[in-house]
Amino acid sequence: MKNETYVRAFYKTGVYVAELIEMQEENQRALVKVLAVLRHPTQGDLHNPKMTNVPFFHQRKALAQFEKTWVPLSSLKSYDEQVPDYKTSLKKALEKQISELESQDTDWSRACLEKLKECQNEYGL
């Protein structure tokens, strides 16, 4: 992975195309700069997945374009395809997740859809 410029980075529940900025093998982490969104983060309480009866049902936004973040080295994979446009990829990832949730009829999916619609408005999509 040392010579990779672009990587697929998993951060919390989102997946991103990112530029590899720095690797710290001794700390098992890498600094990446977000270029595109492949999977929008899952909404809700990560410690109680698919549950709505939790103290706080989190809204989780995608990392912003060019945002830098540390990710575990184990979460990186090489990315050899053309890097998509950030806004286009964000819209596609969000629409895919909304579509998947609309096909479900649960309290959790409805709560997620509500949070995703808020994200959609805040993103200006």
Q: Residue locations for each model-derived region?
A:
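Short coil-to-beta transition motif at edge beta-strands of beta-rich domains
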Residues: 1-11
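Short, solvent-exposed secondary-structure boundary/capping segments
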Residues: 27-35
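Intrinsically disordered, low-complexity, charged/polar segments
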Residues: 38-107, 125
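Glycine-rich, aromatic-bearing surface loops/beta-hairpins
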Residues: 111-125
